[in-house]
Amino acid sequence: MREILHIQGGQCGNQIGAKFWEVICDEHGIDHTGQYVGDSPLQLERIDVYFNEASGGKYVPRAVLMDLEPGTMDSLRSGPFGQIFRPDNFVFGQSGAGNNWAKGHYTEGAELIDSVLDVVRKEAENSDCLQGFQVCHSLGGGTGSGMGTLLISKIREEYPDRMMMTFSVFPSPKVSDTVVEPYNATLSVHQLVENADECMVLDNEALYDICFRTLKLANPTFGDLNHLISATMSGVTCCLRFPGQLNSDLRKLAVNLIPFPRLHFFMVGFAPLTSRGSQQYSALSVPELTQQMWDAKNMMCAADPRHGRYLTASAVFRGKLSTKEVDEQMMNIQNKNSSYFVEWIPNNVKSSVCDIAPKGLKMASTFIGNSTSIQEMFRRVSEQFTAMFRRKAFLHWYTGEGMDEMEFTEAESNMNDLVAEYQQYQDATAGEEEYEEEEEEYET
């Protein structure tokens, strides 16, 4: 079967990951001891995508958990699903990365990376036909960003033909945890552009907004935010885990969403999002789902798709739906908002349908869009980066770990190139495209 190996790193990654496993276990009828207590044969049919079956019919997640300090892991172990993970798969250091990318990537992280790779190798050998990896991490801290990208590049070397998908939490514009976030994020993006296949871009501010506006929560906790993320993560992979009329997997997703290899940063959304009080008043229908799914307020990162154009998009519908109706609604969206789609990629919206809805819902949908407006995120981080780097602020923390200023300059220009590429394809029209391409080829 097409297994996916899940890796979570750093505090943020481990907290998102923990929530994700709660959702996945719930969908497959696995209780917190790893025993199957479900009621449908469909839950077990392809359970091996995310779980190993151990002795005594116990199901163990294919998850590798890493951190440079023991704190988050300890609280995860004592949490509701702490006992389900394989104890050998917890890999942690003691020193912490102190929000320093260089520590995660070059010094502390580099010491721990081999033991992480051993666990990854063991899990990969345990699988029958590994499809790829999914990594949960944040880009603002030290471990998730520095060590996370180090691990991604090592895995890339060892498994070059497997898909690499990341769920990356970007630093958000108004909610900042640390001063050096722009440095860490820029250095990470520099790595992700080269080594990852698909990046789902998330950020806390957009998630807070969804909690306030749509879910009407007065004071949302990180638990609430992570729940949103885990709903999306489960939606992206549901086609692999349950039978469906139109299936997709990580590779199909990539082929349909990535027109140019560097432009693989996606916005994600989930529908239906309703506040707990108002659920009973609305019946779900495909048009309503589609409407909410494409709504700019629903995107889980702080970029507004109305400021750019969609290169491609993909929608995963779950539940007992008619494929015909899904297709009609998707065509409808494209026809009504044709100016928001680039005209030089015809049929650029793909939909897939999975028969099993998430727990407690009749139908749901997950949205993944490759929009040029994501450049807003990179642009914002890049401006903050430049403001500090111009004054060489906080730089000694990085050079002290053996980094070179040159690396910062490279990362900065790579990020700016990425923004320029998005802008170029946003402005391109069907007619002039061929000539531009030719000119560029001669120049290089």
Swiss-Prot record:
Chain sites annotated for binding Mg(2+): E69
Needed co-factor(s): Mg(2+)
SMART domains reported for this sequence: Tubulin, Tubulin_C
InterPro entries: Beta-tubulin_BS, Beta_tubulin, Tub_FtsZ_C, Tubulin, Tubulin/FtsZ-like_C, Tubulin/FtsZ_2-layer-sand-dom, Tubulin/FtsZ_GTPase_sf, Tubulin_C
Cell location: Cytoplasm, Cytoskeleton
GO biological process assignments: microtubule-based process
Keywords: Cytoplasm, Cytoskeleton, GTP-binding, Magnesium, Metal-binding, Microtubule, Nucleotide-binding
GO cellular component: chloroplast stroma; cytosol; Golgi apparatus; microtubule; plant-type cell wall; plasma membrane; plasmodesma; plastid
Annotated Gene3D superfamilies: Helix hairpin bin, Tubulin/FtsZ, C-terminal domain, Tubulin/FtsZ, GTPase domain
Family stated for the protein in its record: Belongs to the tubulin family.
Subunit structure: Dimer of alpha and beta chains. A typical microtubule is a hollow water-filled tube with an outer diameter of 25 nm and an inner diameter of 15 nM. Alpha-beta heterodimers associate head-to-tail to form protofilaments running lengthwise along the microtubule wall with the beta-tubulin subunit facing the microtubule plus end conferring a structural polarity. Microtubules usually have 13 protofilaments but different protofilament numbers can be found in some organisms and specialized cells.
Misc. comment: There are nine genes coding for beta-tubulin.
Name this polypeptide is given: Tubulin beta-4 chain
Species of origin: Arabidopsis thaliana
Gene: TUBB4
